[in-house]
């Protein structure tokens, strides 16, 4: 789209300076006019829009699957029942600190007031998400060195859980924005 816009712009500028085009014949100028009009006609449907127009037309709104939010009490219970080995993991602290906001988790995400609290929640969720993505990457590297089928099944299962949790966190972040 951008290259076509650029070509149409250049052709239009050339037509505006028709007196400078000594080598063009009448026929070439007419051809250029016709092709420029055709390009501009096709480009009009791709005209750039402002953010305000896009928001007004609800193009930027995405439907978010909030069914994952119903699992929050179960997830919180799992977090409280983890072993000491997991508590030493780098993921544990931000997830535990997120439980401070459990009183907000019963609300619709978009109804959380804008401000410092929402910013803190988003920051913690993004931190958790980045650490989960790093964990998923490490698990994918670990798969290559596994020779035991039970360990392989366990790693694949944990990668699926990581990916599902990452998707849940990303959808929650999108609904908070």
From Swiss-Prot:
<dbReference type="GO" id="GO:0044423">
    <property type="term" value="C:virion component"/>
</dbReference>
<keyword id="KW-0946">Virion</keyword>
<keyword id="KW-1048">Host nucleus</keyword>
<dbReference type="Pfam" id="PF03555">
    <property type="entry name" value="Flu_C_NS2"/>
</dbReference>
<keyword id="KW-0945">Host-virus interaction</keyword>
<dbReference type="InterPro" id="IPR005188">
    <property type="entry name" value="Flu_C_NS2"/>
</dbReference>
<protein>
    <recommendedName>
        <fullName>Nuclear export protein</fullName>
    </recommendedName>
</protein>
<keyword id="KW-0813">Transport</keyword>
<feature type="short sequence motif" description="Nuclear export signal">
    <location>
        <begin position="91"/>
        <end position="100"/>
    </location>
</feature>
<dbReference type="GO" id="GO:0042025">
    <property type="term" value="C:host cell nucleus"/>
</dbReference>
<comment type="function">
    <text>Mediates the nuclear export of encapsidated genomic RNAs (ribonucleoproteins, RNPs). Acts as an adapter between viral RNPs complexes and the nuclear export machinery of the cell. Possesses no intrinsic RNA-binding activity, but includes a C-terminal M1-binding domain. This domain is believed to allow recognition of RNPs to which the M1 protein is bound.</text>
</comment>
<comment type="subunit">
    <text>Binds M1 protein. May interact with human nucleoporins and exportin XPO1/CRM1.</text>
</comment>
<feature type="short sequence motif" description="Nuclear export signal">
    <location>
        <begin position="117"/>
        <end position="127"/>
    </location>
</feature>
